[in-house]
Each structure stands twice: as C-alpha cells, then as structure tokens.
C-alpha cells in the first residue's frame, strides 16, 4: 500500500533567512485543516497576481483579495470584485462581490454577496516569519439571504495586503494568506 506523504509544515521549515535568500516574492497560505505551503509569483502577473505552489496549485489575488484558486479543493473558479486598489477606497459604501464555484455537474454556481468594509483606526504591528510590519486592519462583512462571511485584511501604508484571512469555499473554509516577501 502507498504510504500517505507526510505533510510538510512550512511554519517549521521556512525561516526569514530562507525567505530573503530566495530573492523572489513568496506567499504563505494555510487552510483551516492546517495544511500549508509557500507559493511563488507566476511570471507575467499584472493587476491580478497568480501564485504557484510546488505541487501545481494556484491562487490568484487582486491586491491580496482572493479571486480564484486551482488545486485547493472546491475551487473558486473566479470572482468579480470592486475595481479599487485599496480597501480604504471602499469604506462607507456597500458593494457587491460575486464568487463563482462549479457544481458537481460542472454548472456555474454564483455566490452573490453584499459587502461592507470597515477599518480599525489604530495601526498595529504584525510579525510574519520574524519580520514586523506596521499595518491597518480591515474587516469585511459579506452576506446573501442565507449566508454570511467575514474576511480580515492587514494592509501596510502603501495599501499592500500583507496578511489576510479570507473565505475560500464551504468545504475549505477560510484561508490564512501571508505575504512573505
């Protein structure tokens, strides 16, 4: 019988020294199950960045906001999100987000969400793999008639998302996403 490969815990193997010596942008993601890994930026990404893991899974982010995944299970096929770069520009105005999933028989299943975002006014310091970042925290609440979800984003003074906790799908739950470099 095949033995199940032991899941590597990136938190135990990756150090700041490894991150810096890699010399490339790196992303860390972790599922609610504890499964985690690092991804590198796919060349040629523009406003939507696509990050690729060693085993071929991808995650696409628009300034840190989850827009699509492949290979994570119950994948997010695509999303329509507001076209503003920073969350700050969304404050005070409700907006719509559409998350597209596939049903078992390959039909599109769109989750249409009404969302609002608010900002915690005090900046805070977060540490990601031994590196500290001064950030502002944003709290996004989205709902449909029978579903509610919450996303958290930590952005630096340039509006770059350094860390987030975002809803991925009903089966995967939330993803923790951290920008390592």
State what each model feature region is:
Residues 1-60, 65-73, 92-181:
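Acidic, serine/threonine-rich low-complexity disordered tracts
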Residues 79-81, 86-89:
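Surface-exposed beta-loop interaction hotspot
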């Amino acid at each position: 019988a095949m033995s199940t490969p032991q899941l590597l815990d990136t938190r135990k193997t990756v150090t700041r020294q490894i991150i810096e010596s890699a010399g490339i942008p790196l992303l860390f993601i972790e599922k609610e199950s504890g499964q985690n890994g690092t991804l590198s930026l796919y060349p040629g990404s523009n406003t939507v960045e696509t990050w690729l893991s060693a085993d071929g899974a991808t995650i696409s982010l628009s300034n840190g906001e989850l827009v699509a995944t492949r290979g994570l299970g119950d994948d997010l096929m695509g999303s329509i999100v507001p076209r503003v770069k920073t969350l700050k520009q969304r404050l005070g105005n409700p907006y719509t987000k559409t998350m597209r999933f596939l049903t078992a028989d390959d039909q599109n299943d769109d989750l249409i969400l009404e969302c609002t975002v608010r900002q915690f006014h005090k900046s805070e310091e977060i540490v990601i793999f031994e590196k500290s970042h001064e950030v502002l925290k944003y709290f996004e609440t989205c709902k449909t008639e029978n579903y509610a979800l919450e996303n958290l984003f930590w952005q630096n003074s340039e509006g770059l998302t350094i860390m987030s906790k975002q809803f991925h799908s009903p089966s995967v739950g939330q993803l923790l996403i951290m920008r390592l470099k």
